Amino acid sequence: LTVTDEALGEKNLAALQDYCREAEPYTVLLPSACAISSQLLPEAALLFDQETWLQNAAAALSPLCREVLNAYPLLEENGDSRLFYRTDSRPTQLTGYLLYQALGQALDYFPYAKDSFSNTPLRYDCTGDLYARWSYDKVRADVVTALLPLEDSRSYTITHTAADGTVTRWNTLYPLEGTAEIDCILGGPAAIIAVTAEGSIPRSLLILGDENALCVIPYLALHYDRITYVDVTRCSEEQLAAIAGAEYSRTLLLYGAPTLLNTDLTAGLTALTQS
């Protein structure tokens, strides 16, 4: 992880604090793959100290949130597992399951045991956003898998809404048609992703976050019949105003360190805070 302007991370943190004062959300802070797998990198590699930064960020947000989960220790403890893809910066569905387990008490559900799921391949030979950065061609492509419930009578609908209002729908959490590569998880990133799970408990969850959040949403849909994921950097002002005016049973913030440190979230978070 390269950080070009450390001041941006502090600005984002301040904007998150302002939002948390208003919304009192639950919050998850996620490290990137290089922080968890630093032992695999050359000794000369200069790495930003994500561990300390996330600790400080969690300490700053904790007084303003119902609960803050710094996921660094959790992922470090499970570092021998495939938590991130080889060729894409997104976390795998196994990381999603670990977060799902950790969030049970905060989001008021009893997590299903891992033996209630089947590890099922969805797509082979996938390459993501990191593939072109490798200086050699010996990096193996990824297999995208999902932990699918062994028994699940729910029916699911995903609705993607782009900033210009364009809408795309699927009747599955893992659409293979109309998607490419790793985007078969919830159809990939979008400004707004609305998930309905007919048969789950009738309550709603708002998730403000980045594409890291997509790995945990399928599990949360086992316990919430309406989940709305929002990427504030992709939304229009009108969309943010509509989100701010809606009511949800719970609100979750889920951001990865690369987004917090290198992507300006301030305008979107401020729009939600002031609406």
Label the predicted regions.
Residues 1-275:
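Extracellular glycan-modifying ectodomains
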